[in-house]
């Protein structure tokens, strides 16, 4: 199959990478796993055993008229322990390489079908100026866009840093969530070739 390149000849690409059937269940599983892996998982609360304080019975069992109590660290007391205290945990889910690559291919194929993948010969700017990048995107009629280049262009990265809904990544930095999140994905010809090699 071929991808149309803006202002240049069409680019021949692999059917298995850019013409794959849409697999919603696979993409959902991989996206959920990716989001789960991004969770910090460091929350920690103290149980009644871990709260600092005396273990002495606050008052005798009978005769005071007050409710019976055996421990100031009881969960029903103010500043007591938490009944089911949250502990640090690893939320990451295992995703096989084959599944991950399959999901990326499926997303790229769907982007092609929806005309959301824009292939350009090169995407460069002369200076790290946001104004220059805004004008370049306006010329291509692009707003909400992910720009993927073969290697990270510092000028491009710095210019896009302050723009809302514009992100710049190299091929190694792409992930299923960012590919889905943007309305358009701009890819250079060299990046397309690298993606094909990476997903082969």
Swiss-Prot record:
Please give an example of a GO cellular component term from this record.
Answer: ribosome
Assembly notes: Part of the 50S ribosomal subunit.
Region spans: Disordered: 43-71
Identify its protein family: Belongs to the universal ribosomal protein uL4 family.
**What's a single GO MF annotation on this record?**
structural constituent of ribosome
Q: What does this protein do?
A: One of the primary rRNA binding proteins, this protein initially binds near the 5'-end of the 23S rRNA. It is important during the early stages of 50S assembly. It makes multiple contacts with different domains of the 23S rRNA in the assembled 50S subunit and ribosome. Forms part of the polypeptide exit tunnel.
Record InterPro entries:
Ribosomal_uL4 (IPR002136), Ribosomal_uL4-like (IPR013005), Ribosomal_uL4_dom_sf (IPR023574)
> What species was this sequence derived from?
Mannheimia succiniciproducens (strain KCTC 0769BP / MBEL55E)
SUPFAM superfamilies according to UniProt: Ribosomal protein L4
Tell me the name of the encoding gene.
rplD
List the Pfam families: Ribosomal_L4 (PF00573)
Might you name a Gene Ontology BP term for this protein? translation
Keyword set, alphabetical order: Ribonucleoprotein, Ribosomal protein, RNA-binding, rRNA-binding
Protein's name according to its UniProt entry: Large ribosomal subunit protein uL4
């Amino acid at each position: 199959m071929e991808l149309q390149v803006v202002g240049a000849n069409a680019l021949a690409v692999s059917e298995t990478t850019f013409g794959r059937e849409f697999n919603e269940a696979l993409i959902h599983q991989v996206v959920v796993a990716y989001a789960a892996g991004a969770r910090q998982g460091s929350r920690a609360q103290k149980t009644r055993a871990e709260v600092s304080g005396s273990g002495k019975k606050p008052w005798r069992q009978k005769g005071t008229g007050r409710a019976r109590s055996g421990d100031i660290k009881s969960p029903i007391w103010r500043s007591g322990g938490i009944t089911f205290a949250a502990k640090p945990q690893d939320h990451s889910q295992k995703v096989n390489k084959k599944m991950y690559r399959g999901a990326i291919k499926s997303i790229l194929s769907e982007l092609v079908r929806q005309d959301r993948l824009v292939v350009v010969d090169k995407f460069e700017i002369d200076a790290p100026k946001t104004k220059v990048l805004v004008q370049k995107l306006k010329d291509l009629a692009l707003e909400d866009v992910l720009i993927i280049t073969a290697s990270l262009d510092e000028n491009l990265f710095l210019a896009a840093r302050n723009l809302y809904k514009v992100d710049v990544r190299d091929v190694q930095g792409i992930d299923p969530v960012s590919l889905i999140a943007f309305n358009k994905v701009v890819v250079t010809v060299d990046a397309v070739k690298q993606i094909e090699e990476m997903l082969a």
